[in-house]
Amino acid sequence: MRLYLLRHADALPGADDAQRPLSPRGEQECRCLAKFLERAGIEFEAAYTSPLLRARQTAERVLATCRAREDLQAVVTDNLSNETSARAFTDWLGRLSAAKHVLLVGHMPSLAERLCALLEVEPSAAFRLPKAGLAALARDESGTVTLKLFVSPKVLGLK
């Protein structure tokens, strides 16, 4: 199984954090990342997102442009919110279907913490996922997880 941990793209500021939409830059980040994923031949079979608007919009924009099952919609889950414990996230992840390519859209700092936990590295070595940053992980049958790809908007040519 390949897991793609994606931090939501840039969002507009706002008083209601849960309802902050993507900014024009965030829309551009999504297009750029989705085109990269499409060129890489990655076809998502499952997708999950935090309930916050900017994460849902990021998932929608990426899935609309890159290769994915035609009817694939991101499932909204609290397991990708910052309030969910690492243990609850790990338990949830263990119950996911055996899809080959799974997109997970969430937030900092929890995505970096989950990344460290999955890779079995110290949290002090936390990865910094920029907005619209993506970490691709491979999990084999034995449960061993390896980092396969780390992409940021800067790497894709966005300043």
Regions found by a protein language model. Give the residues of each.
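Alpha-helix capping/helix-boundary segments
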Residues: 54, 110-111
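Generic beta-sheet signal
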Residues: 3, 98-106
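Alpha-helical structural signal in soluble globular domains
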Residues: 36, 61-66, 92, 114-117, ...
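Domain-level recognition of soluble alpha/beta enzyme cores
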Residues: 119-148, 153-156
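Glycine-rich phosphate-binding loop signature in dinucleotide/nucleotide-binding domains
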Residues: 40-42, 95-100
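Short phosphate-binding loop-to-helix
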Residues: 78-98
